[in-house]
């Protein structure tokens, strides 16, 4: 076989189709928090259609539902829940206070 013809041969690997993220019975609604929370990042941002693997219509409905939930304060606009903990290096010790006086 020629090299030029060999490049166009397809490999016969098995292809597993992914399940759709939204089933036919799921209702896209601002009250359905379990469904909506799957399409929001850790920072509270709406994930893109490419990441979600949604259709255009589904992405539009998800976006509207997320925005409605934010307005009704069911979802936060930003998710900045950082735990600020003092480490030993940042805490002041009594010996440091005594020296400054």
UniProtKB/Swiss-Prot annotation:
GO terms, molecular function: rRNA binding; structural constituent of ribosome
Chief location of this protein within or outside the cell: plastid
Key words of the record: Chloroplast, Plastid, Ribonucleoprotein, Ribosomal protein, RNA-binding, rRNA-binding
Keyword Ribosomal protein among UniProt keywords: yes
GO terms, biological process: translation
GO cellular component terms listed in the entry, alphabetical order: chloroplast; ribonucleoprotein complex; ribosome
HAMAP family per the UniProt record, alphabetical: Ribosomal_bS18
Quaternary structure annotation from Swiss-Prot or TrEMBL: Part of the 30S ribosomal subunit.
The name this protein goes by in its record: Small ribosomal subunit protein bS18c
Organism: Lactuca sativa
């Amino acid at each position: 076989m020629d090299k030029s013809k060999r490049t166009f041969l397809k490999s016969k690997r098995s292809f597993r189709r992914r399940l759709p993220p939204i089933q036919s019975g799921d209702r896209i609604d601002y009250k359905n928090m379990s469904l909506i929370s799957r399409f929001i990042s850790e920072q509270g941002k709406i994930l893109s259609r490419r990441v979600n693997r949604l259709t255009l219509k589904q992405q539009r409905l998800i976006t509207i539902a997320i925005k409605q939930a934010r307005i009704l304060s069911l979802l936060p606009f930003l998710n900045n829940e950082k735990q600020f903990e003092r480490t030993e290096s940042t805490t002041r010790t009594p010996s440091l206070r005594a020296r400054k006086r």
